[in-house]
Amino acid sequence: MKHGIQSQKVVAEVIKQKPTVRWLFLTLTVKNVYDGEELNKSLSDMAQGFRRMMQYKKINKNLVGFMRATEVTINNKDNSYNQHMHVLVCVEPTYFKNTENYVNQKQWIQFWKKAMKLDYDPNVKVQMIRPKNKYKSDIQSAIDETAKYPVKDTDFMTDDEEKNLKRLSDLEEGLHRKRLISYGGLLKEIHKKLNLDDTEEGDLIHTDDDEKADEDGFSIIAMWNWERKNYFIKE
């Protein structure tokens, strides 16, 4: 919950400062792993690979910033773990100007493959966040996706206690000392300026009651002004 509320505030401030920016929702995956040791190494490799990829010239030249969250899900058929990143990417409008600036899905796949030093084509999804959604701001939807819990207990709990303990042990080892939420670029600067604490290490004692009131009163509604070609925050 806390990450979602903080992210809403950061995105709202970005839009106020740079109303012409555009947004992408990126999902990056690699092959599944089967135990805690493999999971821990894979998550470390992904964090390093992501940093490398965001420095590639074609990506970096239009990059304003990003918000990244790592999620782990479990395949109940083979008991493997799927680790993937959800990334809300903020780019300059020039990103969509021409082929010299625009990064298509095939290129995202190749960039991620190169950054991760993989010998296979990974599954990468990239979605342009549309200016307006009939029922809900697409930006809010993307924030909700990146703000999900890294692992849901309903994903790994079964009727088999031994299996549950094994999964819990794997996840504890796999997630040990891993930063699952991070900001970059302008979003990181704004997160710091707003004095938002670390969602992984900050004050969690007062989260439920204090943040619930905040959540009720702060849901980002980013509307698109078609004449000015920019976003504005609807009060």
Curated annotation (Swiss-Prot):
GO biological process, any: DNA replication
Binding residue positions for DNA: 149
Keywords of this entry: DNA replication, Plasmid
Keyword Cytoplasm among record annotations: no
Bilayer-crossing regions: none
Molecular functions per Gene Ontology: DNA binding
Family: Belongs to the Gram-positive plasmids replication protein type 1 family.
Role according to the record: Produces a single-strand nick in a specific site of the plasmid, and this nick results in single-strand replication by rolling circle mechanism.
Name of this protein: Replication protein
Species whose genome carries this gene: Staphylococcus aureus
Name of the gene: repB
